[in-house]
Amino acid sequence: MPRRLISSGGPWEGRFGYSRAVAVGDQVFVSGTTDAGPDGRSQHPDDAAGQARAVFGIIEHALGEAGFSLADVVRTRMFVTDVVHIGKVTAVHGEFFRDIRPAATIVVVAALIDPSLLVEIEADARRSSD
C-alpha cells in the first residue's frame, strides 16, 4: 500500500527526517505537532490554549491534505510541560472534538524541543467504511 507523506513546512521536518503526517490506505498518522514558527519558537508564548488552538489548526490542515477531516480522528495524544496547562488544553480539545470524541491521552512531560513550547499534540485518523 503506498504511503503519502504530508509536510507542513515546520522547522524540523526536513532537518530531522520526518513528515507532519503519513497517510496509508484508510489511515493517517499526524506527528507530534507544536505551534513553532520558522525560528523554532512558539507563536503563542506563555499561552497554552493559544498553542493548542494553533496546533489543532495545523493538524486539521494536514488531515485535509491527506483527504481526511477532524471527524475521522480516532485518537489524540497531548503533551504539556506543566500540570497547570491541562485544563486549558483539554478545553480547546473539547472545542474541536466535543461531538467527535476520539480516544485521548494527556501527559505531563519535563520539556519539549524549545522552552517556549508548552503543548505538543499527535493525532491518528481512520476513514470510516460505512
List the predicted regions and their residue ranges.
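N-terminal presequence-like segments and the immediate start of the first folded domain
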Residues: M1-G57, H61-V74, V80-D130
